[in-house]
Amino acid sequence: MLGNILIIISVAAFIHAKVNPVAQLDLSMYSGRWYQVIKDRFDDTFQGDVSCAVADYGLTDANVTVLNSELDKDGKVEQIAGYAFYNPGNSGGDLTVKLDGVPASAPYWVVELGPIVNDQYEYSIISDNLNLSLFVLTRNVSRYYDTYEDAVKTSLTQYGFTGFLTKPVTIPQTDCDYSKY
């Protein structure tokens, strides 16, 4: 059984179009609060049937602080903290993330950035070196759906996020009380 799962994951990794991290990433424009509007089916280590997911990123001298928050299916707040960093020789959107309680670090590749408004990127598409994980973050949920959703979906298709494990899954962001976290 485990062997079959590993084969499926291996095949899925090679049927995608190759994505690359962005060459330039201004971390000061990347920090702050993000609302997660899309995830993938494969990456459910922290997420399952969730809503109102946010990511708060801050800057320190050495790292980017990470606090991911969401509501589970019962409306309970779930959070996980950690940090992102550059491995030696990496730059741009080629980061690594380490989350508390998760045994291994993981690639965090920013593969596309939206336009800059008020000194912040409007949206971000994140994946990894195998194109298995997928996250779409936005600064403003309404503006994302009104202005950027079609372009992002086109990009996701071009990047190969169309398979069973990697097909984009919308995270509900309606009736959210973000003051809980």
Residue spans for each PLM region:
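A beta-rich soluble binding module of mature secreted/lumenal proteins
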Residues: 3-4, 9-181
